[in-house]
């Protein structure tokens, strides 16, 4: 694990040390305790998303200890969707939904999974592949929004009997309530092509980026990299934006961008300035993706998005 806490000593001491700093299961690091005699390695925090269970097993193998795994899905041999998400590199938009998915699988039920990306391998026990995201319990997609994949599943509604007149339905008819929001797993398949004026600050780039994400309906965590022309490779505002977002910056020379295929919005001014008629759209397309959001200009910054295909696998690494 690249972000983990390993304690050598009593688990209780480790718990007291960790407790004041626990924030969220999506951001907390793995926490593992191993006793001084190297007999037991115990995951204490972030067993699935943080990888503490896996770390405990790794430490146990190295020290000749016994890993003490207590998470219900692992104990019962049930698929852990959050472990799969971590291994597949997917971000969790609404972690509160993990419990609902796991609870259904633990009770012997089934869940439907919809993915915008191909997934190789046999689905785990209890998981069905859905062709309609509106009927999915798990949605794997770069697109954001509370309604993404939202559904009303007639077989699992939890309505109550209401009197006539309140819903316009006859007395005794159950009012159908919407199903819970699906677990949304964000796949990092978006390339953000970015152009900017010289000296553009990180805040201006972030503002334009978030505006574009909102208009495109894209989760910001779906962006895998930023791309631009090579003359912007040392633009401090752009570099600071990428550092804050923890994404790489790909740069391309003007002659390479000019050969990128696809429909773009040409600009004579941009051509005269940097040698190619468009930066953001061509940079977004340079990695071979499909343009899904054309140029947005805001505050001296231009942003465009392309989507690349990423093949996922049900096999955990």
Feature roles, as predicted:
Residues 154-155, 164:
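Low-complexity intrinsically disordered segments
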Residues 4, 8-53, 58, 62, ...:
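Conserved mixed alpha/beta catalytic, RNA-binding, or beta-rich assembly cores of soluble enzyme
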Residues 1:
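N-terminal glycine-/serine-/threonine-rich phosphate-binding loop
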Residues 210, 221-282, 288-291, 297-301, ...:
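C-terminal non-catalytic interaction/assembly regions of soluble proteins
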Residues 136-145, 184-185, 281-317:
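C-terminal edge-of-domain segments
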Residues 51-60, 89-94, 267-281:
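A polyampholytic, Gly/Pro-enriched intrinsically disordered region
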């Amino acid at each position: 694990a690249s972000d983990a806490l390993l304690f050598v000593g009593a688990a209780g001491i480790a718990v007291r040390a960790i407790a004041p700093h626990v924030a969220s299961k999506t951001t907390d690091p793995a926490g593992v305790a191993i006793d001084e005699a190297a007999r037991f390695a115990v995951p204490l925090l972030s067993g699935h998303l943080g990888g503490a269970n896996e770390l405990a097993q790794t430490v146990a193998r190295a020290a000749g200890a016994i890993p003490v795994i207590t998470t219900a899905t692992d104990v019962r041999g049930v698929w852990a969707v959050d472990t799969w998400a971590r291994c597949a590199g997917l971000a969790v938009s609404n972690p509160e939904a993990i419990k609902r998915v796991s609870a259904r699988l633990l009770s012997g039920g089934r869940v439907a999974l919809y993915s915008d990306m191909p997934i190789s391998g046999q689905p785990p026990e209890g998981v069905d592949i859905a062709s309609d995201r509106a009927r999915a319990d798990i949605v794997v997609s770069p697109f954001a929004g509370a309604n993404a994949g939202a559904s009303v599943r007639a077989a699992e509604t939890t309505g109550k009997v209401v009197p006539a007149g309140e819903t316009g339905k006859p007395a005794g008819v159950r009012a159908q309530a919407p199903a819970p929001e699906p677990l949304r797993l964000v796949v990092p398949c978006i390339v953000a092509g970015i152009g900017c004026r010289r000296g553009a600050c990180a805040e201006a780039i972030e503002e334009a980026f978030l505006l574009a994400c909102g208009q495109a309906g894209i989760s910001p965590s779906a962006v895998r990299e930023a791309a631009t022309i090579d003359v912007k490779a040392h633009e401090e505002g752009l570099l600071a934006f990428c550092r804050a977002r923890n994404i790489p910056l790909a740069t391309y020379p003007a002659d390479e961008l000019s050969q990128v295929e696809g429909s773009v919005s040409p600009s004579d001014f941009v051509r005269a300035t940097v040698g190619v008629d468009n930066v953001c759209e061509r940079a977004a397309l340079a990695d071979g993706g499909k343009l899904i959001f054309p140029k947005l200009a805001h505050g001296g910054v231009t942003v465009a998005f392309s989507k690349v295909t990423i093949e996922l696998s049900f096999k955990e690494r």
